[in-house]
């Protein structure tokens, strides 16, 4: 495609924190460009998944191609790529941004700048994108446009003098946003090679078509019938159809350089078209792939087990189907003495885990038990080998372990100055070490290195509660650090329950063991015999509590009489309980497995 035809293409993305009105702004842009008829419009057109709608978040990237007649009379092709806003999905954001030349930074004029938009904005600036600030929700009585502009300049460091002030809800000034896109965002630049290079922004599975990939053609063109090569896997596929979303799917005869659209090739699963990979022609391949591709690594692992063992094949099928759509989801079969057969699943973070579990339960009608999530530790064995460990019950015997290393993350927290003290106290409690504090206008940026294990469980909730909801968090993985870690096992009547094992810092082991025993004591129902709950590190018992037996009053029909008669009856009862304890099994309810999650609450 010549540089003339590329001159009127604008590829842009929207960067925003959760709830700052990104999807609503997208709706208005689609409406103004006539992408959908008025009767077809609905709130958050692009959030197609019901969970995305309910939670008010965007999970998968989506795209729309719209024609726009500008005020100078020219028709421009706007390709808008919608990105997820949550920290778990930051890799998908970086891929969406790599496909654009510019980005709209949407900031809620009432709330100001938040951490997630800062992180994504830095990614955009690093990739050389033109960032256009947009202040949304100016119809709110609490909106303060000047303060929001000052914050953008202080926190992010880009000029916000000519930021566009809009209200996506009422549609005020949306035309100014479109003019800013056309005049301030540059067209795609011609590349040095004429061979096909296309970046995969996202892939999803369609029941009728197989895998549909959202791509940005950097150079060359893709037509139905051409044979393409996926550069990271080395596999070739035949292209069946290509087209764009308007947001409805529309077929075209070809996708040219600078355009964003979908392709449908004979790919069977999403792993055949990984996000961030490069497509090229098999007959005439490009000399090198586009930069920035990386395998998605799960950071949080948990066991998922069906409540009813007969649902195991259905769970496998449901996970297989979900994995077609979700390249970051990993799973492998696992069996647990306490829970039966299930799967060990890997997720990007806690939100990702919740969404997967919710989709399994809702879309596939499964009733699931999940074990406590753990992060991936590195174990250095005495023979010098290093193994990753995502399941505490699989920890090798301690005499074979040289050291255990935990993942450390760098957390950037943005907060109003009033809550700095509370947040520092929270980070110190979580074994954090402070990197720095910067005062930026009306916000404070606090940087900490924290153990990931402390962050994945409930750090986000606690951060919101100590800052009354004002603080926001962004984090990324740094490295593995060695430390004195031990595994705390839970024994019920002397039997180890593998699903309740946790790995903790040695200094916390006693306290966590005690808390776990107390919590379990409240959750395990009383039996006809005493149930001993113990927490152990290795062979050493560190805590114990007992669920007392239910007992019948065997002395009820003894009036006065001989004490030896009473003794005999009590001894007989005791003997019976003892025999019962030898054969009795304790059923552990689902709540008990979640007790590990709610330990600090």
From Swiss-Prot:
BP GO terms, sorted: positive regulation of translation
Entry annotated with the keyword Protease: no
Topology relative to the membrane: Peripheral membrane protein
SMART domains cross-referenced by the UniProt entry: EFG_C
Binding residues for GTP: 19-24, 136-139
Transmembrane segments: none
Compartments where located: Cell inner membrane
InterPro entries per record: EF-4, EFG_III/V, EFG_V-like, EFTu-like_2, G_TR_CS, LepA_C_sf, LepA_CTD, LepA_IV
GO cellular component, one term: plasma membrane
Catalytic reaction annotation: GTP + H2O = GDP + phosphate + H(+)
PANTHER family hit by this protein: TRANSLATION FACTOR GUF1 HOMOLOG, CHLOROPLASTIC, TRANSLATION FACTOR GUF1-RELATED
Family: Belongs to the TRAFAC class translation factor GTPase superfamily. Classic translation factor GTPase family. LepA subfamily.
Role of this protein: Required for accurate and efficient protein synthesis under certain stress conditions. May act as a fidelity factor of the translation reaction, by catalyzing a one-codon backward translocation of tRNAs on improperly translocated ribosomes. Back-translocation proceeds from a post-translocation (POST) complex to a pre-translocation (PRE) complex, thus giving elongation factor G a second chance to translocate the tRNAs correctly. Binds to ribosomes in a GTP-dependent manner.
Cross-referenced NCBIfam families: lepA (TIGR01393), small_GTP (TIGR00231)
Protein name as catalogued: Elongation factor 4
Organism (species): Xanthomonas oryzae pv. oryzae (strain KACC10331 / KXO85)
């Amino acid at each position: 495609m010549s540089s003339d035809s590329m001159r009127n293409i604008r590829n842009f993305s929207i960067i925003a924190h959760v709830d700052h009105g990104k999807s609503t702004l997208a709706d208005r842009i689609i409406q103004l460009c006539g992408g959908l008829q008025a009767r077809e419009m609905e709130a958050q057109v692009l959030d197609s998944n019901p969970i995305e709608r309910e939670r008010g978040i965007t999970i998968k990237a989506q795209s729309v191609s719209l024609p726009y007649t500008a005020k100078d009379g020219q028709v421009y092709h706007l390709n808008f790529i919608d990105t997820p806003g949550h920290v778990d999905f930051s890799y998908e954001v970086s891929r969406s941004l790599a496909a654009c030349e510019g980005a709209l930074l949407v900031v809620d004029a009432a709330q100001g700048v938040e951490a997630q938009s800062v992180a994504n904005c830095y990614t955009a600036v690093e990739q050389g994108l033109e960032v256009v600030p947009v202040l949304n929700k100016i119809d709110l009585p609490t909106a303060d446009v000047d303060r929001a502009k000052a914050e953008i300049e202080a926190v992010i460091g880009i000029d916000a003098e000519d930021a566009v002030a809009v209200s996506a809800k009422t549609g005020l000034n949306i035309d100014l946003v479109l003019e800013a896109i056309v005049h301030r965002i540059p067209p795609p630049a011609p590349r040095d090679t004429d061979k096909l290079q296309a970046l995969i922004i996202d892939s999803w599975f369609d029941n009728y078509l197989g895998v549909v990939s959202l791509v940005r053609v950097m150079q060359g063109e893709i037509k139905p019938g051409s044979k393409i090569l996926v550069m990271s896997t080395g596999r070739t596929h035949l292209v069946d159809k290509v087209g764009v979303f308007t947001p409805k799917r529309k077929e075209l005869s070809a996708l040219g350089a600078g355009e964003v659209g979908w392709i449908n090739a004979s790919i069977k699963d999403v792993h055949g078209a990984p996000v961030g990979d490069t497509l090229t022609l098999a007959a005439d391949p490009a000399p090198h792939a586009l930069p920035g591709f990386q395998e998605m690594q799960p950071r949080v692992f948990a066991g998922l087990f069906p409540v009813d063992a007969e649902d195991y094949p259905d769970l496998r099928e449901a996970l297989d189907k979900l994995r077609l759509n979700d390249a970051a989801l990993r799973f492998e079969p696992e069996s647990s003495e306490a829970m039966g057969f299930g799967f060990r699943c890997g997720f990007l973070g806690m939100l990702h885990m919740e969404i997967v579990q919710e989709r399994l339960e809702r879309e596939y009608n499964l009733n699931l038990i999940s074990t406590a999530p753990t992060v991936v530790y590195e174990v250095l064995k005495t023979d010098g080998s290093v193994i990753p460990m995502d399941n505490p019950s699989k920890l090798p015997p301690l005499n074979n372990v040289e050291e255990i290393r935990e993942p450390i993350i760098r957390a950037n927290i943005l907060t109003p100055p009033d809550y700095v003290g509370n947040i520092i106290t929270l980070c110190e409690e979580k074994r954090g070490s402070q990197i720095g504090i910067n005062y930026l206008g009306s916000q404070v940026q606090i940087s900490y290195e924290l153990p990931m294990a402390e962050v994945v469980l409930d750090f986000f909730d606690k951060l919101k509660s100590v800052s009354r909801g004002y603080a926001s968090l962004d984090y990324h993985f740094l490295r593995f650090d060695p430390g004195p870690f031990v595994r705390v096992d839970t024994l019920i009547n002397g039997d180890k329950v593998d699903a309740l094992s946790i790995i903790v810092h040695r200094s916390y082991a006693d306290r966590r063991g005690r808390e776990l025993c107390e919590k379990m004591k409240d959750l395990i129902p009383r039996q006809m015999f005493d149930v001993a709950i113990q927490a152990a590190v290795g062979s050493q018992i560190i805590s114990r509590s007992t669920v007392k037996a239910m007992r019948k009053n065997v002395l009820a029909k003894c009036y006065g009489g001989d004490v030896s008669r009473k003794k005999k009856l009590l001894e007989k009862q005791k003997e019976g309980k003892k025999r019962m304890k030898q054969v009795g099994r304790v059923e552990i309810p689902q709540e008990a497995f979640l007790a590990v999650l709610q330990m600090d609450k």
